[in-house]
Amino acid sequence: MKQQNRRVKSLNVMAQDAVRIASGWLGSRLPDRFGPADPKLDDQGQLWWVPVVLAYPGVTVGQVGEIAVSASSGEVVDHTNLADIKAAGLALGRKHRAKVRAAFLRTRNA
């Protein structure tokens, strides 16, 4: 049986780093209601795939895209198109309007 040689680059960027990088990237391009969620490392150990979620105080509405962060350099190397993220956010916001409104009311009354 042949052994597979998998080239795994050095993991210089940890999960929390990928979230921080994605958060900064999002913050400079989209409104604050879009944020990062828990990342997943790809099978080759080269990219952190960070979900982009629509979130309001007290509620995460759902995923609207993703950002790929290099596990070796920390660079954003790929992402869902910004227009697609915004469109998905609008659609999810409309679909879950009652949930979002309830979260705001809970926050305001706290």
Task: Tell where the protein language model's regions lie, with residue ranges.
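Long, terminal "pre-/pro-" and other extracytoplasmic accessory regions
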Residues: 1-110
